[in-house]
C-alpha cells in the first residue's frame, strides 16, 4: 500500500546546503547512482588520493554507491547499493535489500540475505528460532513453513524479483561492527 512507498522514502536534500542528482536517463522511473554535492560533503579521504578519486568526480560530486530514484519534487527513494544490485538475464535490476526488507518482516524470519545462485534467486534465511519454538514448529516442519513464507513473499514482489528457494541457516549471519551482514561472505 501507500505506507510501503513512504517507508523507502529518504526525503529531500536541503536547498542551499546540499545538492543531489541521480545518474540516470530517467531519474523518476529508472534508478541511478545518487550523487551529492555541497558544503557539508567531504572533500576527500585523508592522505588517500586513490580512494578520493574513486568516489569524487572532477566536478566535486560524491558518488554514494546508493541507487535510487527522485520524484519531480526532489524526494529521494533509495533502492539499494550499486555493489549489491543483481542484473537478470532479461536486463532487470534487482535490489536485494528491498526483497530482504519484506522477508525480514515476515513471521519466523529473523534475518535474510538474497543472493543469485546460477540464474535463480535464493533467500538465505536465519529463522527466528525463539518464535519457531514458542509456536511448536518442529525442525521437520520448518521447511514447509518457509515454503509458505516464500510463496507469500512472491505475491508482494515483482515477477522478476520472485525467490526460487529459501535456504535455512542454523546460525546468524556474520556481521560487521556496525551490525551489517558481511554480504560478500555469502555471494
Q: Which residues does each predicted region cover?
A:
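Conserved C-terminal "lid"/linker of ANL adenylate-forming enzymes
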Residues: 111, 119, 150-187
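Residue-level signal for inorganic ion chemistry
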Residues: 74, 103, 123, 166, ...
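Conserved ATP-binding/catalytic segment of the ANL
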Residues: 12-18, 26-29, 33-88, 105
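Short, small-residue-biased leader/transition segments that mark boundaries at the very start
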Residues: 1-6
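Adenylate-forming
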Residues: 41, 75-102, 131-141, 159-164
Amino acid at each position: 500500500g501507500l505506507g510501503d512507498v513512504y517507508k523507502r522514502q529518504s526525503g529531500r536534500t536541503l536547498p542551499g546546503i546540499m545538492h543531489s542528482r541521480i545518474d540516470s536517463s530517467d531519474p523518476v522511473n529508472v534508478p541511478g547512482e545518487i550523487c551529492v554535492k555541497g558544503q557539508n560533503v567531504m572533500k576527500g579521504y585523508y592522505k588517500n588520493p586513490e580512494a578520493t578519486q574513486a568516489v569524487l568526480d572532477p566536478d566535486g560530486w560524491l558518488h554514494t554507491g546508493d541507487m535510487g530514484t527522485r520524484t519531480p519534487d526532489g524526494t529521494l527513494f533509495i533502492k539499494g547499493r550499486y555493489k549489491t544490485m543483481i542484473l537478470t538475464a532479461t536486463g532487470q535490476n534487482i535490489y536485494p535489500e528491498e526483497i530482504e526488507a519484506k522477508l525480514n518482516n515476515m513471521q519466523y524470519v529473523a534475518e535474510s540475505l538474497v543472493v543469485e545462485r546460477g540464474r535463480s534467486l535464493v533467500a538465505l534465511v536465519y529463522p527466528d528460532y525463539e518464535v519457531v519454538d514458542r509456536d511448536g514448529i518442529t525442525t521437520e516442519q520448518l521447511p514447509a513453513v518457509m515454503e509458505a513464507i516464500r510463496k507469500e513473499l512472491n505475491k508482494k514482489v515483482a515477477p522478476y524479483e520472485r525467490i526460487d528457494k529459501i535456504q535455512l541457516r542454523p546460525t546468524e549471519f556474520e556481521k560487521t561492527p556496525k551490525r551489517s551482514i558481511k554480504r560478500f561472505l555469502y555471494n
